Amino acid sequence: MATATEQWVLVEMVQALYEAPAYHLILEGILILWIIRLLFSKTYKLQERSDLTVKEKEELIEEWQPEPLVPPVPKDHPALNYNIVSGPPSHKIVVNGKECINFASFNFLGLLDNPRVKAAALASLKKYGVGTCGPRGFYGTFDVHLDLEDRLAKFMKTEEAIIYSYGFATIASAIPAYSKRGDIVFVDRAACFAIQKGLQASRSDIKLFKHNDMADLERLLKEQEIEDQKNPRKARVTRRFIVVEGLYMNTGTICPLPELVKLKYKYKARIFLEESLSFGVLGEHGRGVTEHYGINIDDIDLISANMENALASIGGFCCGRSFVIDHQRLSGQGYCFSASLPPLLAAAAIEALNIMEENPGIFAVLKEKCRQIHKALQGISGLKVVGESLSPAFHLQLEESTGSREQDVRLLQEIVDQCMDRSIALTQARYLEKEEKCLPPPSIRVVVTVEQTAEELERAASTIKEVAQAVLL
């Protein structure tokens, strides 16, 4: 039956071919030949290319104007007008040959130039040498690294800790180690740049909530809960993370951790807490925002911090439950593929921890000095203080913007320069403006340390007031 049908179709096709008009057949034949030519012919013929004469080549070379490798940089760009520091940036700092009181470095506990810390680093230098020349998995693990991890875990009262050789890479590596494509991350709009890079590397679905606005965060969590109900199968394999800072670098404010913990359990999310500014600052013993609020540290899934602020060393660490930390030893990019922390810096961090444990009163001293300068800086005409009174790093922003970010930056830099002329070292907060997710307003960043005396704090506040009045009014 099928054979008869096929024969009938073939007969019909032949009959249609005979009955077709001649012009129709000619047109189809031309099209078929043209298609064959296009398939088998080259896109160009070598003989059709005419060689240029030497004179023509020279003219083309002279006319050619290459595009610049980098965009033009204005002469007043900060990268071209940097300050040169001589000696350690501790309590007093020598900038461009001028000695100033340091209100710019994150040396909160004054350990950067501490004799005990330097002695520990020197002893380690004599024992181990300068560096390790290898990552932790390839002969880069020294006993001092394990000692530091053990000390950090005990200090933070967690099961385990892991150290990284670069502070920025700590949270930027930890986030993509857990959060992957398809997962959902709820993050504060004021999150620091290291968190932003970690989120970018994770390729997760990012949802921004207003700074420290728990109502806005819950709104996003509820919306996600509704979406999960529409597709339960996908929801079962989608992980949800909340990423916040204990003390925000860009605002100087403390996160509302108790409310975050409630939302965590209510909506079944995990909390990543970045404590680079709050570690060694908040809490009775400097354990950070969990101790500040009296929160059980087991309620936080992962805590990270760098050791470049309070500990006055280099690198960073993560701490938490053992199974959480062990995962990073194979998945943390900054841990697996970077040379391990130089032993001398690990030894310095251990000695800094010893000092913190031996002198818990140092944290109360720091808080009191923070309150003093916050109070002294209130009421500056043209400037407003941004940050909480407990924060040793806060911002001075213009009360009213000029409408131009460039002009705002110039005004604030003029204040910084005139303060330096009066031996008060400040700095503007700098950002990669084109890469920031939510670019903060221009500001002067002020840093308080335990080494600054009450008289120096008052002097700095009065100097800033006088200079601001002269520049802004």
UniProtKB/Swiss-Prot annotation:
Residues 1-15 are lumenal. The gene is SPTLC1. Its main location: endoplasmic reticulum. It is an enzyme of class 2 (transferase). Component of the serine palmitoyltransferase (SPT) complex, which is also composed of SPTLC2 or SPTLC3 and SPTSSA or SPTSSB. The heterodimer with SPTLC2 or SPTLC3 forms the catalytic core of the enzyme, while SPTSSA or SPTSSB subunits determine substrate specificity. SPT also interacts with ORMDL proteins, especially ORMDL3, which negatively regulate SPT activity in the presence of ceramides. Forms dimers of heterodimers with SPTLC2. Interacts with RTN4. Pathway: Lipid metabolism; sphingolipid metabolism. It is found in: Endoplasmic reticulum membrane. The transmembrane domain is involved in the interaction with ORMDL3. It comes from Macaca fascicularis. This is Serine palmitoyltransferase 1. SPT complex catalytic activity is negatively regulated by ORMDL proteins, including ORMDL3, in the presence of ceramides. This mechanism allows to maintain ceramide levels at sufficient concentrations for the production of complex sphingolipids, but which prevents the accumulation of ceramides to levels that trigger apoptosis. The keyword Membrane applies.
